[in-house]
Amino acid sequence: MRDECLRIPHPSSLIPQKMSRGKRFSSMMRGSIGGMRRVAGYATNKVRARRVRKREERSRELTRVNGARRVVITGIGAITCLGLSLQETWDAMVAGKSGIGPVTRFDASHLPVRIAGEIKGFDASKYIDQKELRRTARVSHVAVAAAQEAYLASGLEIGKDVQHDRVGVVMGTAMGGFEMSESALADLRIGPRKMNPFALPAALPNAPGHHISKVCGAKGVLSTVVAACASGTQSIGDAAEMIRRGKADAMFAGGVEAVINESALAGFALMRVLSTNNENPEGAQRPFDITRNGFVYSEGCVVMMLESLEVARGRGAHIYAEVLGLGVSSDAYHIAIPDPTGSGAVRAMQWAIEDAGVRPEDVDYVNAHGSATETNDPLETKAIKLVFGERAYDIPVSSTKSMTGHAMGASGSIEALATVMSLKTGILTPTINLNTPDPECDLDYVPNVARKDDIQVAVSNSFGLGGQNASIVLARYEE
């Protein structure tokens, strides 16, 4: 099955460096003393006791504070409007580049919004054969491509390092294969026989997870998170929980969105949440700026390979970061407007920190939801202050969406990528286009230029339509 995931060369820049394996504990046997056979049983018991103590020490070393298994990230794959790999995406983030431009997928000249964060130069045929291409939606093509990169980068061999049924998939999406449903409806108007018989299954939200599972031979847990803009974040946290609880040893996890079409763009425009700065696409997404006027709709996918620390260490895997905890809450307020008190966002962050077994004072970076809407940015700022108190002013906060736009169900996983790489490299990605700060948004948003900072523990936020809130705590991996 692994061969099916090796159809394209792995980018040299992403080949993981092998880490030296830790020294294994060796048992120390003592002989009988002075031929005193009568104490042999006692000596044997002492040896057994030492072995038990060593096993217990090793178990504690590989266990989180709350008694569950530790979960680490060993591979990351990315297809975004910034690039077609982890390295391309990360380099663009550090450089503060925008992935926003004019819509090219269709003629948007009649719409009030004509800009988006499109994936550029993606060739699905490199990852999926022609027969499957006709039967699947673009969202699945992008997901499979990102999953293959994550799998290759991890160095994991399913079927050798872990059994097929101990590897699962949790993918998040908001829109799924929405465009396939539209295409089927258009064909139906011509005649029922014109419809693609695979259109409906291709449009299902769980289709991306299915195709990752099929291509990579992951026969364990298969789950799909449909939680609007919080989908990608929650999927990573849910996958980590499966490993912690012993339901899996490794998981593919992430978020995907690949629906930039006429109805999606028109629909969000009617909600008045999109930026109409068509003349300046790269400067259109302006989180925390007083001149912000909405987000830019975009697409993308990030998939991460999660493993139990025991499995990752056992095979000498390269480790990017550790997943510590997840917090999920509901505003129970309005499907399209966040609770003005910010209480839902506060609960998500607090519960994530509690689940991680750390304290608020341990957190030294926040990757914000930062959607650049009129209501979200001051509310998120308020929520961060409520969670961290006066210390909030000392914590750097940045919005990846300033560069990527809002990729809906994929946004959380893209921002998790940024957070993981910030933890690993000590470089914080900037909030670009922040030139005139909103007085209500008065935190340190890492404006316009990346910054070096030796962070250890970070929170990444995703707050979505339907009052869906998800926060995840990630940490630098320490031996």
Q: Where are the language model's segments positioned?
A:
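Condensing-enzyme catalytic core mediating Claisen C-C bond formation in acyl metabolism
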Residues: 70-74, 101, 279-356, 365, ...
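Active-site-proximal alpha-helical scaffold in enzymes
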Residues: 143-156, 205-209, 213-257, 295-317, ...
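Phosphate/pyrophosphate-binding loops at sites that engage ATP/ADP/AMP, CoA/4′-phosphopantetheine
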Residues: 150-163, 311-319, 349-365, 387, ...
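Glycine-/small-residue-rich "gating" segment that lines the acyl/pantetheine channel
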Residues: 190-196, 234-237, 241, 250, ...
